[in-house]
Amino acid sequence: MRTRTQCNAALLEGSTVRFIGTATIGTDHIDSTYCAEHGITVVNAPGCNAWAVVQWVVSILAQINQHASFALTERPVGIVGCGAIGERLARLLEIFHIPVFRCDPFLETASPFRYTSLERIGRECSIITVHTPLTHDGAHPTYHLLDAAFFHSLKQKPYILHAARGGIVDDYELYEAAQYRRIAGYYLDVYEDEPDVAPALLEAAKLATPHIAGYSIEGKLAASRAIVKAVGEFFGWQIAEPQLEEKEDKTFIVGHSIGDLARTYDIVHDSRTLKSAPQQLEQLRIQYAFRHDFRNYHFGNQALERLVQDDC
């Protein structure tokens, strides 16, 4: 099922559904409380498209590195949410000696010296990238995590990158922060009122893509395999694993710089396409030609090669 499908009481009431499989990382489109109360098993595919989202971020970092007044190695990148995507991104950046501040209150308890607060990230980071799930309750809700108070507290005029879920960042306050130069600019792949997006929000973005940061061939295959396996285990079926005809030789990239990695994905093209037809966001997303992510490449940088290939 797609994230656009809201699996809640309105859809499920009176049905015989026992299992819901979503080939996505997020589950905010599923009413997990209702499902638990009615004995419906919910399975998602965490980490399936993590490298595709990391690729999206890296492509933006290469753009920033070309135009900013500082080098990436000179300023810390604040990563908000260090699950499947955030932690992979952090490890990749550390290979290139880019300082990283990790923020994840769910992980901070176990490793307090490894993580820092959102407030510190706001004070000290020149680039902030968001990778949390969207939650409205619990110990650390993320709805409007980046709100007016956050943007007014910023000290470094950072770049804001957002490819998690619409609603984690208050889009209106993000736009206002850019207009009043509290931030250096923003890059978006998700939107609070998606698929209806304010034209001004898109126009002011440095780059904007139609919710496709995680759309890679390798990610789609990984998600399909995970859900097929889960369905088989739940119903006791033997199901053939989805296969992809892989190239005999993966493309080789030196991989000694962020710029090298950015050549694997033309994010500027995707942004131009959306900005030229913002009302077509949903159609652009549906018709998107899935790209290859880092798992399709071999790297001369051995540390990077190990990080990516050991995760395949």
Whereabouts are the PLM-identified features?
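Rossmann-like dinucleotide-binding domain for NAD(H)/NADP(H)
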Residues: 157, 163-312
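Oxidoreductase and adenylate-handling cofactor-binding alpha/beta cores
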Residues: 54-68, 95-96, 205, 225-233
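A short helix->loop->beta-strand "cap" motif at the edges of active sites that frequently abuts
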Residues: 15-18, 38-41, 98, 156-158, ...
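Rossmann-like adenosine-cofactor binding region
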Residues: 7, 107-199
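Active-site regions of enzymes building and remodeling cell-envelope glycoconjugates
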Residues: 15-19, 39-41, 111-119, 202-210
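Glycine-rich adenosine-cofactor-binding loop
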Residues: 46, 54, 73-94
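NAD(P)-binding Rossmann-fold cofactor-contacting core
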Residues: 95-112
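Phosphate/diphosphate ligand-binding glycine-rich loop within oxidoreductases
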Residues: 1-68
